[in-house]
Amino acid sequence: MNTPIYDYLAKYSESGFLRMHMPGHKGRSSENILSKVYPLDITEITDAGNLFENDGIISESEKNASRIFGTKATFYSVGGSTLCIQTMLALMKYDHRNVIAVRNAHRSFLSACVLLDIDVSWVYPVYEDSIISGTVLLCDIEEKLKKTSNACLYITSPDYFGSMADIKSIAELCHRYNAVLVVDNAHGACLPFYKENMHPIALGADMCCDSAHKMLPALTGAAYLHIGNPVYSSKVKEVMTMFASTSPSYLIMCSLDLCNVFLEDQIKQRLKSSEKYIACLKRSDALKRFKTEIPEFYSEPLHFTINAYESGINGLKLAAMLRKRKIEYEYADNTHIIMLFSPIDDADVYNRLENVLDSIQFQPSEVSNLKINFPAPEKYMTIREAAFSEYEEIPVEKSGGRVCAAVNI
């Protein structure tokens, strides 16, 4: 497969052109860790294309990605899924859609709602032992769709824990009510490449975002915006310019270009190996003391979530034990620890983690049934009004009846 962005950068770096253009390092700098990177870092010069135009080497590379993912169109983001989410919601604003969203949305969604002055009608998941991860019921979604004309449903799947919603059934339900389904698939970039294609676009979503940098070999900030409904394709780049930097990173775009090659040539075999390694890890003696299964519709296989609470240990205490043994986790709180595998990880990674978990000794404490009751609060103001209002910081135990001014996750 061709790699138009990488090929151009490699050729230009060796061309001998005198660089009378940005960036200021001019393709060279004093000897440091980035000295081999600078020659590939350019701006929109002749023949380098433009991220926000529909021709040139970047557009050619995006077409490769679209073919690999099986979408109507795919666009690159150098601002992570955050930029994709801003763009998708702006497209819904153009379409005069009324936004319904599942409440465990990421802060990037709420920030985009602030910027676009979108008022949200919330669907609340059924939470078990964490407000980060919960099960959304089809009946609750349908109840909202019945009451909302020209609707858009926004849902996060997989969530931070790796738990996945039944996107196929949700897509069918949305389209029955002529609603648009938008999916934050930031944690699910690998989903098209398992034996069963579980990607939101394949399951009927109208658009979604994938954070390539989260689960694939791509630089931080690299993401894909996928379109399943071609009605929205023509406006994506125009809308994206409202939020994106006018100096997009060619290094990040190059990493997406090269990631496409990995996806086409290697990922399916690597994921087969990953699934085998994970299955062996979960069956190992080291995992007998830890609860790792998530009671959900499905779980993204590379998300390795330990329910510390049900394992009889405080999650932050377990996290400290891991760090002491040089394991850096993705996230930890009192009840859970999240660790992320990647298709890049080999057997040594899994063996090392298994050995560390096996070395951790603790006396499990007796746990009571941790059931979170999270009632739907009364709406007092819009998200934008709350974001720009005066606020004060108070202990969470004294926050009953108050308006939340910001989010943390």
Where are these regions (language model features)?
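Short, glycine-/Ser/Thr-/acidic-enriched flexible segments
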Residues: 27, 160, 214-215, 230-232, ...
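Conserved C-terminal alpha-helix-loop-beta "cap" of PLP-dependent enzymes
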Residues: 286-408
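Short glycine-rich or small-residue beta-strand-to-loop segments that form or flank ligand, phosphate
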Residues: 48, 75-77, 153-156, 338-340
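A short linear hydrophobic-aromatic micro-motif
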Residues: 73-75, 210, 326-330
